[in-house]
Amino acid sequence: LNEMFLVANTYPTGSQEFIDVFETAVRMYPQSEIANINAATAALSRNELVSAERYLGMVNSNKNLPEYNNAMGILMLMKGDYELSKKYLKVAEQLGLDAARGNLEELVRKKANAAKMKKNGK
């Protein structure tokens, strides 16, 4: 599994090749929680929320990982559950994941846009 992660990182993040490696890894190691978190992240990059939720649902013991909390935060953000998104992203940030800070900033922007649209009656 580690070798597959190293291969994935030879491709640009988010590229089809990068995503394909993570999807292959989760097929080869379906019980690996790390493989499922990586596959969920790849699914989120393609806006495949159902797949991402299924992969994240396979994580049972590694819910303290910042990557898991970040992925859950992004999933909840994309589903429009801003409060739950904030909860997960705050945990990821507190666990030291720098990307979570940027995602929290995105959450603030999304909430502001949603409030503005609601105010304008859209």
Report each predicted region and the residues it spans.
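Register position in tetratricopeptide repeats
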Residues: T10-T13, S45, M78-K79, E106-A114
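Alpha-helical solenoid repeat scaffolds, predominantly canonical TPR units
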Residues: V21, R54-Y55, Y88
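Start-of-helix register in tetratricopeptide repeats
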Residues: N2, I34, E67, A99-G102
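Single-residue signature of alpha-solenoid repeat helices
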Residues: F18, S51-A52, S85
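Canonical positions in the second alpha-helix
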Residues: T24-A25, M58-V59, V91-A92
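Canonical tetratricopeptide repeat
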Residues: E3-L6, N38, A71, N103-E106
